[in-house]
Design a protein with these regions (language model features):
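The feature captures the beta-strand-to-loop junction immediately N-terminal to the Walker
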Residues: 14-16
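Helix-to-loop junction immediately C-terminal to a conserved catalytic motif
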Residues: 29
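Conserved ABC transporter NBD signature motif
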Residues: 37-45, 205-207
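ABC ATPase NBD coupling module
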Residues: 45-59, 67, 89-92, 96, ...
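Q-loop/switch helix immediately C-terminal to the Walker
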Residues: 73-85
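ABC ATPase C-loop
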Residues: 138-139
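H-loop/switch region of ABC-family ATPase nucleotide-binding domains
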Residues: 182-183
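Conserved beta-strand-loop-alpha-helix hinge in the C-terminal portion
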Residues: 202-225
Length: 226
């Protein structure tokens, strides 16, 4: 498989179960090591590098809201952990008034009331609130590549729409290069400038711009059945 993601691309990746979507994402993230070939992120060869090493440039939001946050810690403490890449921060630093105010401002942008729950343990948040927090944490450092691993699949339809709208707003505002794995054809068609279909470990379709905008769900369903 040869795939180049250009800076600023928002790529939706679709495919049947077992097509290779998760393998592709896990290889980029570093949880799987390819048998051959080379992988570069932001100009750095990372083929054999660890997840921790790649985290300098790559952030990931998982399908399970619990995986991107620490449930026993407060909302503010989770945000402090997410800022570890920007410098050495104490978990107690959030108690400072200026830190709390900044966090409240960030959380208010999510429109989920989390700005009023800085000291609440994350395990008491709803799935949508927790996933929104995960998304905020993953993008605090403005990563070179944001990986979204079916990040709305565990949410109810309304919350899924809210998190997707939030995703688009953050990606657009920060001009983030993004790869989103999704089973929802409507999301794949609605969001992003590029759509990639994976089948049997190969790229079956790769469209962008106006060509993507012209696609209909029926077109994609036809490709799935081929």
């Amino acid at each position: 498989m040869n795939l180049t993601i250009e800076p600023g691309d928002f790529v939706s990746v679709i495919g049947n179960n077992g097509a290779g979507k998760s393998t592709l994402l896990n290889t980029i993230a570093g949880t799987l090591t390819p048998d051959a070939g080379e992988l570069m992120v932001a100009g750095h060869r990372v083929t054999k590098r660890s997840v921790a090493y790649r985290s300098r440039w790559v952030s990931r939001v998982f399908q399970d809201p619990k995986m991107g946050t620490a449930g026993e810690l407060s909302v503010a403490q989770n945000l402090t952990l997410a800022e570890k890449h920007t410098g050495s921060l104490s978990l107690r630093r959030y108690r400072r008034a200026d830190q709390a105010k900044r966090y409240a401002t960030l959380l208010a942008s999510l429109n989920m009331g989390l700005e009023h729950r800085l000291t609440t343990q994350v395990k008491y948040l709803s799935g949508g609130q927790r996933q929104a927090l995960s998304l905020l944490m993953a993008t605090l450092s403005q990563p070179q590549l944001l990986l979204l691993d079916e990040h709305t699949a565990a949410l109810d339809p309304q919350t899924s729409k809210e998190v997707m709208a939030l995703t688009e707003a953050i990606v657009t505002k920060q001009h983030l290069t993004t790869m989103m794995i999704t089973h929802k054809l409507s999301d794949a068609l609605t969001y992003g400038n590029r759509l990639v279909m994976v089948q049997d470990g190969q790229i079956k379709l790769d469209v962008r711009g106006e060509a993507k905008a012209r696609l209909q769900a029926s077109d994609l369903m036809g490709l799935f059945s081929d």
